[in-house]
């Protein structure tokens, strides 16, 4: 049996560019790709915190250190500069792989400052 699990997440990153006339994709600061484990051309889901839009695209490498989140092509209709987004990548894992499974999550502060990294989400309290 396989399970589809959250592999990586960039939490509340701010969109820095929305470029309609660009080949579709989402450019992400290369340092964040490396830290999160998201691969270039990997399918990603983007959840727009500000307008509720949810869409699928793929990651491309943005300039390292740029703090870039550029939503490109048709996806530029789903997010505008300044919107806060959650970017997730998922993967299939076998039962054996799940024994040591931990996602990589990067949490962003305003201005796309990396505030912390984690591999677990705290239990939500009632």
From Swiss-Prot:
InterPro entries: Asp_de-COase-like_dom_sf, Asp_decarbox
This protein's UniProt keywords: Autocatalytic cleavage, Cytoplasm, Decarboxylase, Lyase, Pantothenate biosynthesis, Pyruvate, Schiff base, Zymogen
Note describing how the cofactor binds: Binds 1 pyruvoyl group covalently per subunit.
Compartment annotation: Cytoplasm
Pathway named in the protein's UniProt entry: Cofactor biosynthesis; (R)-pantothenate biosynthesis; beta-alanine from L-aspartate: step 1/1
Reaction catalyzed: L-aspartate + H(+) = beta-alanine + CO2
An example Gene Ontology molecular-function term: aspartate 1-decarboxylase activity
The keyword Lipid metabolism is assigned to this record: no
Modified-residue entries (Pyruvic acid (Ser)), positions: 25
GO cellular component: cytosol
Name by which UniProt lists this protein: Aspartate 1-decarboxylase
Lineage: Bacteria, Pseudomonadati, Pseudomonadota, Gammaproteobacteria, Pseudomonadales
Gene of this entry: panD
